[in-house]
């Protein structure tokens, strides 16, 4: 009887851990989608190219189908960010430096998607890279790769 109760509690706590991991993964995806969506809004000229590039970034980072990536970006767009600290802290906690650098590269790709880098886009990516603790050299290398120079 005691063993059966222990097994039930173990299953319940294991289920809770699985739900927590799923919730954490969703938080991470929403944080990344939120930053990509903000990147599309920075220059006030949201084009199809920027949206497609942001979707490709989500697909590349998380292996999602295009429709799910678009849905996450749409959901992130409906929730206006009031601070970049919350998504940045979630991303810092859950992604390695290499993965955060890939995110910065994806932000640069969205910035360059319309073939015109706005000064506000440049400032935004640098600010986010700083919040993510991505070193400036890595940020600039990511910029070159996104531009097709590296």
Task: Tell me what each language-model feature is.
Residues 1-38, 42-150:
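Small-residue-enriched hydrophobic alpha-helices in membranes
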């Amino acid at each position: 009887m005691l063993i059966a109760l222990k097994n039930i509690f173990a299953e319940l706590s294991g289920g809770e851990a699985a739900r927590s991991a799923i919730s954490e993964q969703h938080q991470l995806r929403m944080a990344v989608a939120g930053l990509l969506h903000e990147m599309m809004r920075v220059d006030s000229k949201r084009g199809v190219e920027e949206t497609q590039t942001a979707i490709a970034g989500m697909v590349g980072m998380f292996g999602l189908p295009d429709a799910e990536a678009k849905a996450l970006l749409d959901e992130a767009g409906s929730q206006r960010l009031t601070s970049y600290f919350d998504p940045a802290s979630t991303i810092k906690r859950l992604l390695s430096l290499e993965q955060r650098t890939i995110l910065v590269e994806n932000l640069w790709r969205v910035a360059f998607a319309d073939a015109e880098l706005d000064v506000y886009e440049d400032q935004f990516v640098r600010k986010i890279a700083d919040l993510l603790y991505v070193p400036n050299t890595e940020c600039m290398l990511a910029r070159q790769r996104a531009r097709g120079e590296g």
